[in-house]
């Protein structure tokens, strides 16, 4: 009987500790080690599952709103530095706490350059399976973006903020990751737009 109990205990311990996708957690939110310089969250801020769209945030803002315009943007036209980890401006830090933060432009570029991107559908949601150099992966849903009160490109494109403002004197833009079924890259967005935020942790 003791052997049976010991065997069952070992099985339970293995089931709890075995994470086939390389996932782990911090402050109640899961992350995946892709073999990059930072670990990427399994979900977007405001989402409970990887395929959920989650919330949309204007750059440098930590709460959602019904309309995303130049007039109600807190950072549009304002000279800013990188906001990573600043809870007054970083939606990941403000909403998730701990060491969570928005990824920098360089970290997003690393995600593009060092990972394999496969357009797919997960539980009926279009997006990319992004597989890191170590074989682990995350799913980024094509959640679109918000301008004014409209949601654009949901299901066909994804737009994710970096923490980095544009570096060529334009105080109205910040860098973000964009993708569609035909590819992905980095671009500049008006800060007033509502984009997704996928946190990272070191």
Question: Which residues fall in each region the model found?
Answer:
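Bacterial Sec-dependent N-terminal signal peptides
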Residues: 1-24
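C-terminal, surface-exposed recognition/capping segments
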Residues: 24-202
């Amino acid at each position: 009987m003791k052997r049976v109990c010991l065997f069952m205990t070992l099985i339970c311990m293995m089931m709890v500790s075995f994470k086939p996708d390389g996932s782990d957690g911090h402050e109640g939110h899961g992350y995946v080690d892709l073999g990059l310089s930072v670990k990427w969250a399994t979900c977007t801020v405001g989402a409970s599952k990887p395929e959920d769209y989650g919330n949309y945030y204007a750059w440098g803002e930590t709460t959602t709103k019904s309309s995303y315009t130049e007039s109600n943007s807190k950072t549009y036209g304002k000279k800013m530095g990188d906001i990573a980890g600043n809870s007054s401006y970083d939606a990941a830090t403000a909403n998730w706490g701990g060491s969570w933060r928005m990824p920098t432009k360089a970290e997003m570029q690393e995600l593009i350059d060092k990972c394999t991107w496969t357009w797919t559908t997960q539980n009926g949601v279009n997006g990319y399976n992004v597989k890191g150099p170590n074989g682990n992966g995350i799913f980024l849903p094509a959640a679109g973006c918000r301008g004014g009160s409209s949601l654009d490109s949901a299901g066909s494109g994804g737009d994710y903020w970096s923490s980095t403002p544009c570096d060529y004197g334009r105080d109205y833009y910040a860098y973000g990751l964009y993708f569609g079924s035909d590819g992905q890259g980095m671009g500049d967005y008006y800060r007033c737009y509502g984009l997704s935020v996928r946190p990272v942790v070191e």
